[in-house]
Amino acid sequence: MYRALTHDIEVTVEPYYLEEQSDPDDSRYVWGYRIIIANHSDVAVRLMTRYWHITDENGQVDEVSGPGVIGEQPLLNPGDTYEYSSGCPLDTPSGVMFGHYSMEAEGGETFNVAIPAFSLDSPGLVRTLN
């Protein structure tokens, strides 16, 4: 698992390879990821937007942004957690994702919360280091 803590908001990511949705012969590799957002602060916050920076093993970058996550803009009161799952297809057997959520505190303050960088690696992938 991968974790980041920003402004007392913790983001935990657990990626997993979706073999049944992948087709390596057609250069299609798909991962799912489970995210848990925990509000360790003493104020309520709402997740307003998301931003993803996705890089495949060839260095091809895809940026994704938009309102909320999976169609929701969840409100997290102090001590609350919010969990969701989503996915990411790539044309290569590995890649890396990271990003941030834009949050709004109950007083109207907005701030970004880091989504930690995490690796997308196909099972059985052999890496060679020079």
From Swiss-Prot:
PROSITE patterns: APAG (PS51087)
Pfam families reported in the protein's UniProt record: DUF525 (PF04379)
Domain ApaG: 3-127
The organism of origin for this protein: Sinorhizobium medicae (strain WSM419)
Protein name, per record: Protein ApaG
Gene3D superfamilies reported for this sequence: ApaG domain (2.60.40.1470)
Transmembrane region(s): none
NCBIfam families the UniProt entry points to: PRK05461.1
InterPro entries for the chain: ApaG-like (IPR050718), ApaG_domain (IPR007474), ApaG_sf (IPR036767), Uncharacterised_ApaG (IPR023065)
Disulfide bonding pattern of the chain: none
